[in-house]
């Protein structure tokens, strides 16, 4: 089984992805974590690394190759913005988590114990950079509602749901499909 979980920063995709992987006894891979790890290796903040990656598309290509590599192995939950676009029909289920910006930033601040304004600025920069890079590199528009509705099997707004409620909704949907 291959499950792709996508969503903007702070929607809950990493938390839910890890819980799904545990529940179904699957591996878990996160491109977001790989991105953060690369930033740390280069001794850069996420903002600095985001700007660096804009000038070095090979980093995005390398991260996307890893998604394809892990997907080929199977039995995995992949947390990736582009995973559903890159893998399309070779995935069992594609999940998109959504949530309004203010709630997402509050979650990120709680997770990282940081400042709201700082995380808002960083997140907006990262998301704009990702949208621009993915459009330029792959001609993918992550905001296209028609493509979103056609591509994803499950779309959940996580704003007013607990982690357990989101997990339960996804598991119920997966049980209907399999």
Please place each PLM-identified region on the residue numbering.
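Hydrophobic anchor at the beta1->P-loop junction of P-loop NTPases
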Residues: 5
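P-loop (Walker A) phosphate-binding loop of NTP-binding proteins
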Residues: 8
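Post-Walker A helix-loop "phosphate-sensing" segment adjacent to the P-loop in P-loop NTPases
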Residues: 22-29
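ATP-dependent small-molecule kinase phosphotransfer cores
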Residues: 31-87, 101-102, 113-118, 124, ...
């Amino acid at each position: 089984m291959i499950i792709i979980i996508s969503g903007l920063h702070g929607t809950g995709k990493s938390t839910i992805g890890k819980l799904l992987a545990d529940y179904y006894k699957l591996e878990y891979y996160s491109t977001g974590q790989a991105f953060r790890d690369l930033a740390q290796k280069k001794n850069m903040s996420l903002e600095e690394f985001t700007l660096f990656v804009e000038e070095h598309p090979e980093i995005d290509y390398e991260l996307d190759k890893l998604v394809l590599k892990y997907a080929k192995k199977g039995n995995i939950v992949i947390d990736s913005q582009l995973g559903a676009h890159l893998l399309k029909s070779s995935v069992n289920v594609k999940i998109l988590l959504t949530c309004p910006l203010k709630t997402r930033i509050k979650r990120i601040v709680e997770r990282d114990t940081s400042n709201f304004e700082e995380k808002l600025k960083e997140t907006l920069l990262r998301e704009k950079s990702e949208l621009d890079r993915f459009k330029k590199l792959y001609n993918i528009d992550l905001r296209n509602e028609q493509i979103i509705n056609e591509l994803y099997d499950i779309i959940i707004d996580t704003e007013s749901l607990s982690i357990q409620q989101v997990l339960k909704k996804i598991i119920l949907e997966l049980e209907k499909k399999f």
